[in-house]
Regions:
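Sec/Tat signal peptide C-region and signal peptidase I cleavage site
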Residues: 15-18
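Aromatic-rich carbohydrate-recognition surfaces in CAZymes
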Residues: 99-127, 131-185
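Intrinsically disordered, low-complexity segments enriched in polar/charged residues with Gly/Pro
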Residues: 1, 87-89, 167
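Low-complexity, Ser/Thr/Pro/Gly-enriched N-terminal "stalk/linker" regions
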Residues: 20-104
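Bacterial N-terminal signal peptides
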Residues: 3-12
């Protein structure tokens, strides 16, 4: 179970950090580990929020509970741009602080939410939108790995390839196709 392994490794890491750093040894998580979720979350899933509450209550280590409650929803809170376009679900996923969507990264970013999709119609629509967007991107340029949200141009426009303003980067690798197939499957 990937969640169990993540929690185990996080606990191990936190115990190592606590041993080396007195700042992390603070028992009161209101000082060092103050949780700050964005006030304007981009996408909210009540199912994911309920799971965060459920798991956090089970964790005896407050720092680990804080880490879990901030990590699990981070993609939803900060990178998901869901909308309908021409009556169809469409989801553009920012990759970190860059306002572009990488095929590999967007698939990996939403992967943890698949387990909640059966219970959450809103989450299903968002995931369907990611798959639709990835397919649309691949059909637009099968050799690109990262796309803009429309014809905005960008830093890599001077690449020695057939760049178009809808492309962020044209550096295709096999995982540029594997991750969309994995997500759609």
């Amino acid at each position: 179970n990937i969640l169990g392994l993540s929690l185990f490794l996080s606990t191990f890491y936190l115990s190592e950090v606590q041993a080396e750093s007195p700042a992390y040894a603070v028992q009161d998580n209101t000082t060092v580990y103050q949780s700050k979720r964005p006030d304007s979350r981009l996408f909210v899933s009540q199912t994911v929020d309920n799971e965060i509450d459920r798991v956090s209550k089970m964790l005896k280590n407050k720092k680990l509970a804080w880490m879990f409650s901030n990590c699990l929803p981070n993609t939803l809170d900060t990178t998901i741009h869901y909308r309908t376009q021409d009556g169809e679900d469409d989801t553009f996923v920012y990759t970190g602080d860059i306002h572009a969507m990488w095929l590999r990264d967007s698939g990996a970013q939403v992967w943890p939410y698949l387990r909640f999709a059966q219970q959450d119609k809103k989450l299903q629509k968002m995931l369907k939108g990611v798959i639709r967007r990835q397919i649309k991107c691949i059909l637009f340029d099968p050799y690109a790995n990262a796309f803009n949200d429309g014809p905005t141009g960008g830093y890599w426009m001077s690449d020695n390839t057939k760049m178009k303003p809808e492309l962020h980067e044209r550096k295709w690798e096999i995982d540029s196709l594997c991750y969309p197939i994995r997500l759609a499957y």
